[in-house]
């Protein structure tokens, strides 16, 4: 193990010990991804994991890798949340109805929370988890845009002094895989083939490299086709969608202001035609 990783492990454990005691009312948002598994192992090593409620938040698009992994973890409670019940944006109802129609007409991946992940994390979870004083996450600072808007440091202080604690916030991707190898940690089987999980495939921002798209195409061709249907639809109709859902900030940020990504996709599609 490198000295750099040893120092980061010490730092992460100290963050946990300095901000949590067994008397605290705490929970852990367990995603079944590699980062969550690492935090889970750190909590276990510190002998505090059994005192923390562990939740997997169901999105309606759980792949078999995640479902199989959850079966091996009876200590993790799976919960589903009605996003429309918690979201403040009145247009989410119109958005939901519109998407159901879009699914059928364009053979697009069906997910309950499609187009609302950012709202879901900031609005839904913040309300649902309000009863806890501390929420642990596996978020890292080099995570994607929508995650970084929710957690911006290893310790995020919320209203009434509630905390979001992300012990491995400063870890790199290399740190994570070194720790996993050193501790012989079992991951979701998707990591063996793809190197990531399929659970966020519904988000065009998540897989914004042609390399990732090629992996999806190789191992899950039907899923790839439906994902590309979504991307092409959003690209072709982005101006109309902006007019229709102009006040839904999360929708605009996630899909309509990302022209640089759609240009990449357009280029990729043109190559496929040749």
Locations of regions flagged by a protein language model:
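ATP-dependent adenylation/nucleotidyltransferase module used to activate substrates
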Residues: 1-183
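ATP/NTP-dependent adenylation/nucleotidyl-transfer catalytic domains that generate, transfer
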Residues: 21-25, 182-274
């Amino acid at each position: 193990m490198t000295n750099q990783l040893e120092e980061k492990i010490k730092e992460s454990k100290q963050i946990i010990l300095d901000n949590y005691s067994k008397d605290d009312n705490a929970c852990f948002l367990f995603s079944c991804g590699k980062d969550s598994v690492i935090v889970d192992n750190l909590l276990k090593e510190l002998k505090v994991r059994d005192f923390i409620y562990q939740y997997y938040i169901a999105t309606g698009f759980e792949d078999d890798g995640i479902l199989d992994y959850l079966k091996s973890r009876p200590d993790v409670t799976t919960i589903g949340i009605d996003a429309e019940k918690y979201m403040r944006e009145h247009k989410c109802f119109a958005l939901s109805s519109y998407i159901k129609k879009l699914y059928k007409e364009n053979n697009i991946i069906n997910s309950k929370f499609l187009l609302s992940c950012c709202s879901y994390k900031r609005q839904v979870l913040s309300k649902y988890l309000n009863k806890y004083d501390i929420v642990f996450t596996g978020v890292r600072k080099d995570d994607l845009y929508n995650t970084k808007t929710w957690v911006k440091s290893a310790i995020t202080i919320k209203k009434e002094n509630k905390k979001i604690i992300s012990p491995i916030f400063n870890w790199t991707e290399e740190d994570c895989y070194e720790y996993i190898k050193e501790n012989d940690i079992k991951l979701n089987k998707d990591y063996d083939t793809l190197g990531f999980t399929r659970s966020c495939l519904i988000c065009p921002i998540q897989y914004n490299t042609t390399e990732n798209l090629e992996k999806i195409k190789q191992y899950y061709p039907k899923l790839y086709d439906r994902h590309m249907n979504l991307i092409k639809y959003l690209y072709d109709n982005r101006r109309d969608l902006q007019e229709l859902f102009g006040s839904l900030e999360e929708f605009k940020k996630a899909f309509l202001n990302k022209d640089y990504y759609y240009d990449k996709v357009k280029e990729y599609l043109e190559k496929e035609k040749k």
